[in-house]
């Protein structure tokens, strides 16, 4: 049974109903419809914390989806799952892949910055300030890109950039 039929969440049900209506009225190929169905089911599984199921759906959606913009969001969501699982190298890979297809994803830049900042903090705990600074510099670059795309957002990152004198 498709995940959209078994989900009990009101918002997810509403999204599924609207998505199903749009799939019927918007002229799309059967492959595009199938890709969206996998994407929708992946989002539903992800929202419930069923990451393995979400990944299966997202991988299938990436196999079918041909539009780069739509693929960027699928890849971004895969990155989110890897981030949640502590698989930061994989997460960074998927955020990069998402940005290759859609360079206007400030949330991907932000998440990459958060991972780099976290790695900088880890390096400090291990006593390696040189490596930490390198990670912090990389985090700053990603945060600058996120802020440039959405001025007024990422206030904490903006403050960190000012405090650490990394904001130009």
Curated annotation (Swiss-Prot):
Pfam family, one: TPR_1
Main localization, broad class: plastid
Family in the record: Belongs to the Ycf3 family.
Record-linked NCBIfam families: PRK02603.1
Membrane topology of the entry: Peripheral membrane protein
Role this protein plays: Essential for the assembly of the photosystem I (PSI) complex. May act as a chaperone-like factor to guide the assembly of the PSI subunits.
Swiss-Prot/TrEMBL TPR repeat ranges: 35-68, 72-105, 120-153
Origin species: Nandina domestica
Record protein name field: Photosystem I assembly protein Ycf3
SUPFAM superfamilies, alphabetized: TPR-like
GO biological-process terms attached to the record: photosynthesis
Record's subcellular location: Plastid, Chloroplast thylakoid membrane
InterPro entries to which the protein is assigned, alphabetical: PSI_Ycf3_assembly, TPR-like_helical_dom_sf, TPR_rpt, Ycf3/AcsC/BcsC/TPR_MFPF
HAMAP family in the cross-refs: Ycf3
Lineage: Eukaryota, Viridiplantae, Streptophyta, Embryophyta, Tracheophyta
